[in-house]
Amino acid sequence: REEWSAFHTHYGFQPAPEKDPDKELAFDLNTYSASVKARFIGSSSWEHTLGWDGQHQQNDISGYSFLLPEYHRSTTGLLWLTTYKPNNILSVSGGVRYDYGYIGISPHEDVYLADYLRRQGYDDEQVESYKWNSHAVRKHFGDYSFSLGLVWTPSVQHMVKVNIGRSFRLPGANELAANGVHHGTFRHEQGDASLKSEQGWQMDASYNLRYHGLSVSVSPFVSWFSNYIFLRPTGEWSVLPHAGQ
């Protein structure tokens, strides 16, 4: 993806790039994925599935502005799923999966911002804090998910489903290493390299009634996150000249 706009800057002393001076942003994201699944049927009542998948991403950037850092990200996961169906009335399934992930984020220094802040009289500590659009991060993750479900169909008129599970999400590059103004929201966003995977629990149930062409369904859903990743305002002003303040 590329975004082109006539060169502009918040610093009068920043020269336009010699090559492609009007290329504001460019992202070259390459994704490679692979997966393998094997199904085993133990009997007429039991079915098992073993699976593996992996993915590698490489993001390269260019342009005179900055939005996302360069990074490479690799994930791999192994899963096992079992289904037990003794008859046409009852079906029980359960599965577990473990994932491992690694992300390496490249640092990005804004030398023109550093020069601007020095000219404005900010001390070395403040300059060092603000001049990095992204920090170097090397992070390993490991987490698991599981699910357990039941389907009960006592008759053609009634069906009951119940599911419970645990899920997770690995933090993205911006959540780990961002340090600058997000122009879509006009706020200074700062990542946290100590973040762990986001974890959540889900439970849902449903009851479906069919009677003489009438169908009635009730399906409550509950979700709870034990390590939810969210924006936490600090109440502090950003010193960046393009912070929209």
Regions found by a protein language model. Give the residues of each.
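A short local loop/turn or secondary-structure capping micro-motif enriched for an aromatic residue
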Residues: 11-13, 57-59, 101-102, 169-171, ...
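Residues in flexible loops and secondary-structure boundaries
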Residues: 16, 62, 94, 106, ...
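Face-selective signature of the C-terminal outer-membrane beta-barrel domain
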Residues: 1-147, 151-153, 210, 217-220
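Outer-membrane beta-barrel signature, preferentially recognizing the C-terminal barrel domain
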Residues: 123-153, 159, 166-225, 235-245
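Helix-centric, low-specificity signal for extended rod-like, repetitive segments
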Residues: 91, 159-162
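Extracellular/periplasmic, surface-exposed regions of secreted and cell-surface proteins
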Residues: 229-231
